[in-house]
Regions:
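Beta-strand-loop-alpha-helix segment that lines the small-molecule cofactor/substrate pocket
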Residues: 22, 27-75, 89
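Short loop/turn elements that flank and shape the SAM/SAH-binding pocket of Class I
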Residues: 6-9
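Alpha-helix C-terminal capping/helix-to-coil transition sites in glycosyltransferase folds
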Residues: 11-13
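Predominantly a Rossmann-like dinucleotide-binding segment in NAD(P)-dependent oxidoreductases
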Residues: 63-69, 73-172
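N-terminal Rossmann-like NAD(P) cofactor-binding module of classical short-chain dehydrogenase/reductase
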Residues: 16-18
Length: 172
């Protein structure tokens, strides 16, 4: 296991990588990997914003690499079967879909700033994001709720529901 992904990208024995980092790293990590000759799969969301998404497309073309982004529900046999039933007309002509999330999330509170814990390379973790004083509010799962690192629940959970709706309607 490597703490610095660039060491993995430099390894000529590796053909492809899967990127499952906080969202703010997705684009730069994928571009570095493609520049190093790797094909790339990135977990949702593919990028932190639209501009970065366009950069990923350009990089895949420039380096002639395969780039894929996805959500795990696409791999569910039950969901695949449900989508097939929709497309076969089991419930009629589907013209609209709504994705809903009913998931209570506890308040993460304000943990304030503190010294960086031993073993965490905070400069590397922060990467392309704006450097801020370390707070436990920014790491582990909590990074989702800060724009510097995540996309809130839209980029965390909403993307699953949106993808299901688009897939079911055969528009994405």
């Amino acid at each position: 296991i490597e703490q610095d992904m660039r060491k993995v990208f430099d390894d000529k024995k590796i053909d492809a990588v899967s990127i499952a980092t906080p969202n703010h790293w997705h684009t730069l990590a994928a571009i570095w990997a493609m520049a190093a000759g790797k094909d790339v799969y990135v977990e949702k969301p593919g990028s932190h914003n639209m501009f970065e998404g366009r950069m990923l497309i350009e990089a895949a073309k420039k380096y002639n690499r395969v780039f894929q982004h996805g959500v795990q529900l696409r791999s569910s046999l039950a969901i695949q079967e449900a989508i097939k039933h929709l497309r076969d007309g089991l419930i009629g002509d589907v013209y609209m879909a709504r994705g809903l999330v009913f998931k209570w999330r506890p308040d993460i509170g304000d943990k304030g700033t503190e010294a960086v814990p031993e073993g965490l390379d905070y400069d590397l973790w922060t990467g392309p994001a704006e450097m801020k004083p370390f707070s436990r509010n920014y790491v582990h799962y909590n990074w989702h709720w800060h724009w510097n690192y995540g996309n809130g629940d839209v980029g965390n959970q909403g993307i699953h529901e949106t993808d299901l709706c688009m897939w079911g309607l055969d528009v994405g």
